[in-house]
Amino acid sequence: MPKTALLRPSSDGVAADLMTSLAGLLREWLPRQRWFAGKDRPVTDLALLSMTELYPGCLHLLVHTGHPNPSHVGLRGVPAPGGALSSGDCYQLLLGVREQLPPGLGRALIGRAHDGPLAGLTVYDALYDTRSAQLLLERLRHPGTVGPLRFEADPSVRVPAGLAPRLLDAEQSNSSLVYGDAFILKVFRRIQPGVNPDLEVPGALAGQGCGRVPAPVAWFRTTDPFAATLGVLQPFLPDASDGWTLALGALAAGHGFTAEARELGQATAEVHLALASAFPVGPLDENARTAAAMTERLEAAAHCVPALQPFVPGLRTAFRALLSCDVGPPAQRVHGDLHLGQVLRADREWFVIDFEGEPSRPLAERCGTQSPVRDIAGMLRSFDYAARQRRPWRPEWARRCREAYCAGYAARADWDPREKHGLLRAYETDRAVYEVLYEARHRPDWLPVPMAAIERLAVRGG
């Protein structure tokens, strides 16, 4: 009998011992994954929160990784004096377990277990395995339960059987499987309690008749050790190009991007209007509280990225200016991480995807109401990012795109972002600070891009 046949959800003793087999492998493998959020902090602890055998040879795990407290840790994960081991994350893993690694799955290899219930077996990332990906889709096609896992679907949408899967290779904070160029399944990696906004928001917008966002077709979630969304299946747009690729193509060809930017501004406004109808609108943002939160994030980022420290006094002025400027539009549900990589263009129309928000922020914050200026600032920063991908830098290209985007937004909304200079500068500054911390942790070669914006925002005020 294969050893994995012993790993049933009811086998509490075996499940409790599973980390004996996996802990050493995962300590090495997890920090190398693009979606692992703790790259700048050492993995100090691993704990199995939940284990379910989806089918023989495929284990679904929720694993908690412990890290030193971020407030006591340097950028490269070296605990500062007095550091406490108190923070961590929960990750979703689908692991294949076989005696030998299937052919063609070298990239999926995690390692061979030497101890515990999996001793002598090869462990790999099952999302790379065609058979595992097909069986996962079958679970979604036939709603039901497997241990604490719940598979659910929109009964009005038919998902055909036998769609060939392929795992997308793009850099992202989750893993995505495309099935037959008809559907895409996003498997969330970092799991937090509650309904993931990438399920909640597209579902609500579909109810509003908003065609800018692909609607959920099926999804799966867990009830143990807490209720949480694990993955969402949506229609796939096979002929679409993301905004980042299109913008870089325009730059390479020496073309403008203003028409597309204006239409993108209109699409953003339409999504914001639909969000304001689908979810309760909050009060006008309290600028004092917003300024305090932005300043706190700035101080934390400067602690981790020394290059930021000389600009802190100038950046604080952008946040202090909130105390005397127009409060702007009411707070509402927003995208939360809007940039050119989060929009698709197909058939001359823009679509908005990935409503998770910034994954590093708590889920409760990402699901709360915020100023729509935050999304606008994110997109304006993205035009600057694109313009800086070529030498020499094309500041006029970025300026024209920013202007066109805001004009398009104003044409659909009842207010003009260009008239909210103080708000826009503060949110752009906050976004640039986030970018500095992100790039320093994940892509150090890109750090000069947001640092150039930091200098502009701190010295010249926008």
Roles of regions detected by a PLM:
Residues 4-48:
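Short Lys/Arg-enriched alpha/beta "domain-start" segment
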Residues 67-295, 299, 348-349, 356-391, ...:
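Conserved ATP-binding subdomain of kinase catalytic cores across diverse folds
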Residues 150-163, 298-334:
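An alpha-helical support segment within catalytic cores of ATP-dependent transferases
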Residues 283-321, 400-410, 437:
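Active-site catalytic-loop/activation-segment of kinase and kinase-like phosphoryl-transfer enzymes
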Residues 333, 351-354:
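Pre-DFG segment of protein kinase catalytic domains
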Residues 337:
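Conserved catalytic-loop position in the HRD/HxD motif
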Residues 342-352:
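Conserved protein kinase catalytic/activation segment
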Residues 396, 400-418, 422, 426-462:
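ATP/Mg2+ or Mg2+-diphosphate-binding catalytic cores
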